[in-house]
């Protein structure tokens, strides 16, 4: 029988993002997923494929700015496109526009491709696409490229004080 010495073992440190710490603190059950990545973001459909997950459950987090200078967060399935007119209507604005990529970190505290609806610098009004109400789990960024979490949609909606609306293009 072979003897394995502890000092010969390499242990991988489990990554805990701020999003996971928030979920732990709130005692919300979640599953942590990792996918292979470089330093840059990849599109959400690729992320779903890399994790072997149904793209209907994998959502991306997009940040917009309204006419009145307020920021809004929209969370939609990765294979759908945001409808800015529907988004504006859902938050009571005349119009909203996507924030420039260069402003993502300044506004949210996250980088492009690692933006989570949970744990941003400030709590912004958050709207989920209506499909979030009828799926068994939702998968979103854990706040770092290469890391995703899946949890019950109702838990995520509650923690973000979110609402649901039809916010994607037909």
Description of each model-found segment:
Residues 2-170:
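Extended, low-hydrophobicity, polar/charged segments
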């Amino acid at each position: 029988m072979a003897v394995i010495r502890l000092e010969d073992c390499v242990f991988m440190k489990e990554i805990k993002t701020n999003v996971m710490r928030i979920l732990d603190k709130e005692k919300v059950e979640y599953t942590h997923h990792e996918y292979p990545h470089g330093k840059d973001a990849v599109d959400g459909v690729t992320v779903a494929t890399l994790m072997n997950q149904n793209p209907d459950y994998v959502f991306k987090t997009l940040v917009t700015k309204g006419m009145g200078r307020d920021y809004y967060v929209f969370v939609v399935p990765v294979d759908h496109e945001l409808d800015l007119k529907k988004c504006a209507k859902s938050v009571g604005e005349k119009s909203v526009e996507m924030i420039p990529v260069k402003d993502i970190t300044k506004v949210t505290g996250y980088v492009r491709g690692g933006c989570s609806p949970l744990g941003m610098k400030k709590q912004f009004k958050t709207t989920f696409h209506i499909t979030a109400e009828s799926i068994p789990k939702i998968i979103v960024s854990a706040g770092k490229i290469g890391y995703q979490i899946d949890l019950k949609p109702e838990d995520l909606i509650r923690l973000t004080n979110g609402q649901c609306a039809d916010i994607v293009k037909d």
